[in-house]
Regions:
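Carbohydrate transferase catalytic cores enriched for Leloir-type hexosyltransferases
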Residues: 1-364
Length: 364
């Protein structure tokens, strides 16, 4: 289980654990933890028995550490006595063949589309090994399932989409930003298309002088080298606010009090942020690229061309001027919760693990 609280692969694992704890079934599972994250995860989930992998002595040597983690993973799993191993993220650490029945989650293969050269070859080798050494493969959307099969057409019988869940923290209302604001949450990079959002905002900021733009994400080279020059060119540095190291509780409140949430992403295997915003009854304008058309279920305002800043600006202005009714937002919330609640998705995943284990044991 990965420690990073904001990564989609981590959220997937934590929400599943939350469901297992809620159902009182923690005794049925053992957590296999990287030593880097074990103390914090044990603190969060004291209900589980745990096994740790890795070596403190190798923490300063990333390549050697990863190789050791991979072989230690296989060794500890084979010694565990478990009937099956469920890997919430199939990667270079969990890719080797093990004795128990193995179910790996492949969230998407977007990096196979967006990387080149040696890095692409490395991702291909890892993906090939995960697919080869997994008895079943779970993914998070029908889009991702189709993407996996486009690379691995011969594994159709062992790939299934079980969806993903959206979890918001308890209702502790606190307005964190005094002005009206448009919100974006996510990574800051080319494929998330933040540049177009900034350009679109620059077109309407003067007519929406009381409405700022809040970007929740980590500052990086892309922000410094691509976004900052656009802010300076359009003289909107004071109107665009970058929020880093945001807690889940604060993130919930950023969603809740936003006048509009905009998600212009070009690459998504699932796409939680627009769902998280909509479930808190915030108007959402979203791209429908990749999985987003599927997972948003046609319920949200859509961008025909997310790279067209003029279209985006026009639709942002229209929604801010004529926001949807409370009744409409409530209906959207209810519809999304039917499909993405932690209870429904958690049950689906746990039932699949249990039923697959039973079929495997009967087949032996």
């Amino acid at each position: 289980i990965r420690f990073n609280l904001y990564a989609g692969v981590s959220k997937y694992a934590y929400r599943l654990l939350d469901y297992i704890v809620e159902e009182g079934k923690s005794d049925d599972y053992i957590l296999l933890l990287n030593i880097v994250s074990e103390n914090k995860i044990r603190e969060w989930y004291p209900q589980f028995k745990t096994i740790s992998i890795g070596s403190q002595a190798l923490l300063k040597y990333p390549m050697i550490r990863t190789i050791y983690l991979s072989y230690d993973f296989r060794r500890k799993v084979n010694q565990s006595g478990c009937q099956a191993v469920f890997c919430p993220w199939g990667n270079e650490i969990t890719c080797l063949k093990v004795k128990p029945f193995k179910i790996s989650v492949i969230h998407d293969l977007q990096l196979r589309l967006d990387t080149k050269g040696l890095l692409l070859k490395i991702h291909q080798i890892i993906d090939d090994t995960v697919v080869k050494n997994s008895d079943k493969i779970v993914t998070i959307s029908e889009f991702s399932r189709s993407q996996i099969l486009s690379f691995y057409p011969n594994v159709e019988s062992k790939v299934i989409s079980l969806g993903n869940s959206v979890l918001m923290y308890p209702d502790e209302r606190k307005r964190l930003f005094k002005d009206r604001y448009i919100l974006y949450v996510g990574r800051i990079c080319e494929m998330k298309n933040v540049m177009t959002l900034i350009k679109a905002y620059s077109l309407i900021h003067s007519q929406m002088s009381d409405c700022k733009l809040v970007v929740v994400g980590g500052r990086n080279n892309y922000w410094d080298n691509v976004i900052e020059p656009i802010l300076k060119e359009n003289n909107i540095q004071e109107k665009v606010n970058l929020v880093q190291n945001c807690s889940e509780a604060d993130l919930t409140n950023y969603y809740r009090y936003a006048d509009l949430f905009v998600f212009p992403s070009l690459r998504e295997g699932f796409g939680s942020p627009p769902l998280e915003a909509a479930i808190l009854k915030t108007p959402v304008l979203t791209s429908i690229k990749d999985s987003l058309g599927e997972v948003t279920r046609g319920l949200l305002y859509q961008l025909d061309d997310p790279c067209d800043e003029h279209e985006m600006a026009s639709k942002m202005s229209e929604i801010l001027t004529n926001p949807p009714s409370e009744e409409k937002l409530e209906k959207i919330k209810d519809e999304l919760l039917l499909h993405y609640s932690i209870q429904n998705v958690g049950k689906r995943i746990c039932d699949y693990i249990k039923n697959t284990m039973l079929k495997n044991s009967k087949g032996k």
